[in-house]
Regions:
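Active-site cores that bind ATP or allylic diphosphates and position pyrophosphate for catalysis
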Residues: 71-399
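Class I S-adenosyl-L-methionine
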Residues: 26, 58-62, 171-174, 207
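Structured loop/turn residues at beta-strand edges in well-structured enzyme cores
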Residues: 30, 64, 96
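Short, contiguous strand/loop micro-motifs
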Residues: 9, 44-45, 61, 75-76, ...
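Conserved acidic residues
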Residues: 3, 33, 67, 98-99
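N-terminal catalytic cores of NTP/NDP-binding nucleotidyl/phosphoryl-transfer enzymes
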Residues: 1-57
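A glycine-rich helix N-cap at a beta->alpha junction
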Residues: 58-73
């Protein structure tokens, strides 16, 4: 087949900016180019539950222009920006049909992002980074200073969240030697966590408004707004972090210290700090604040906390996902799936029961991701929506 567009996303929630990325990419490559998305599941990279379930968000994506939505398994969804990008881009590459990777960025230009990505791949960078860290500055600042030695002012690109992910996508393409042609679209509307004018808002602002009970439908495509309104009416969302606090705290308090020391990122005593905090603090925010160190960002501690509660251990996010689970199928999705079935290097799962027969680590990761859904639904407003085992029963949404 011809060009196939790959997009990595969380769609937390799906908004007008996401629809714009699909439209503008098709404007460059052709209006009928199929779009396959790799999307985080019920828990997202910032270490929080998604405001709506992966099934609702995947349905919104295909109703708003995507043709196929695949789930990024839990260990990569809760990984660092580097691990998240490596897993998602690797999964797109393993399908055997994706020709282009499209992503938004605050920069909007490919060349500067590629220069920063190349600098990050410099084998000598680690030595410079360690030297910066010895001065006691936070990791992000140390990395930026080490990069600045190579690319000067371009290192400032790493201060913007979508630029950071864009650079990690490019690194993943280079590292894995994938034949994916990158495209970037200028991200308009709000910067991360800032208000903006017009009908595009950042996902972080929309989550804040949703948490406050505001109507955000003006900033969503109509189909997405209808889906999320349906989920709210049925008591399946929004799922807010505070709704899961008791479930998470009870889980964290039952875990032995060895589990904390085996978490992703549990270096320099972070595992011990998180263990102590989980057994002393009365709130989840208190746990995060007590475990936080000067060197590492709060998001890292939040991810570690969620990994502990959900059973994710160090090394699970190594390499790339060993299967492709289909969450939703859009207009060209069936044709796309037929092509993927012939060319993919990993099993393609359309019926969740097939996940039980996946061999070795693949089966373990599939089950772990399904178990995470059982914890996620405990945050649903309606008690009848909190049934266990739903991930094993759910079929892909078909447009």
């Amino acid at each position: 087949m011809g060009n196939v567009i790959g997009i990595v996303a969380e769609y937390n929630p799906f908004h007008n900016g996401h629809a714009r990325l699909i439209e503008q990419t098709r404007a460059q490559l052709g209006a009928v180019c199929p779009v396959v998305c790799v999307m985080s599941g019920d828990f997202v990279q910032r270490g929080s539950p998604a405001v709506y379930s992966k099934f609702a968000r995947a349905e919104a994506a295909v109703r708003c222009g995507a043709d196929l939505v695949l789930e990024l398994p839990l260990p990569w969804s809760l990984s660092s920006a580097e691990g998240f990008a490596r897993g998602a881009v690797g999964l797109l590459g393993s399908l055997g049909v994706v020709t282009h990777l499209s992503f938004g960025s605050e920069c909007g230009e490919l060349d500067p992002l590629q220069r920063v990505a190349e600098a990050l791949l410099d084998p000598l960078l680690g030595e410079d980074l360690r030297a910066e860290l010895r001065s006691g500055i936070p990791f992000a600042a140390a990395r930026q200073q080490a990069i600045a030695r190579r690319v000067g002012a371009l290192a400032e690109l790493l201060q913007a969240p979508n630029n950071i992910l864009a650079v990690e996508y490019l690194k993943a393409i280079y590292d894995q030697r994938l034949e994916l042609h990158p495209l970037t679209v200028l991200r308009t509307g709000a910067q991360h966590d800032r208000f903006a004018e017009g009908n595009i808002r950042s996902a972080s602002e929309l989550r804040m408004r949703i948490g406050a009970g505001e109507d955000v439908s003006a900033f969503l495509p109509r189909a997405a707004a209808e889906i999320f309104a349906r989920e709210k009416t049925r008591g399946r969302g929004p799922v807010l972090p505070e709704a899961l606090e008791s479930a998470l705290l009870s889980r964290l308090r039952m875990l032995p210290q060895t589990v904390y020391n085996a978490l992703p990122g549990a270096t320099e005593g972070l595992g011990n700090s998180l263990y102590r905090a989980a057994h002393e603090e009365p709130t989840l925010d208190g746990v995060l604040a007590a475990a936080k160190s000067k060197r590492y960002a709060l998001a890292r501690i939040r991810r570690m906390t969620m990994c502990a509660a959900l059973g994710v251990t160090a090394g699970m996010d190594g390499g790339t996902p060993p299967y492709a689970r289909v969450l939703a199928i859009g207009a060209q999705g069936r044709e796309l799936l037929r092509a993927i079935d012939m060319r993919a290097s990993v099993p393609v799962i359309t019926k969740p029961a097939a996940g039980r027969s996946l061999p070795g680590p693949a089966g373990e990761i599939f089950a772990l991701t399904a178990d995470a859904h059982d914890l996620y639904v405990l945050g649903c407003p309606a008690r009848e929506e909190r049934r266990c085992g739903g991930d094993w029963r759910a079929s892909p949404f078909v447009l």
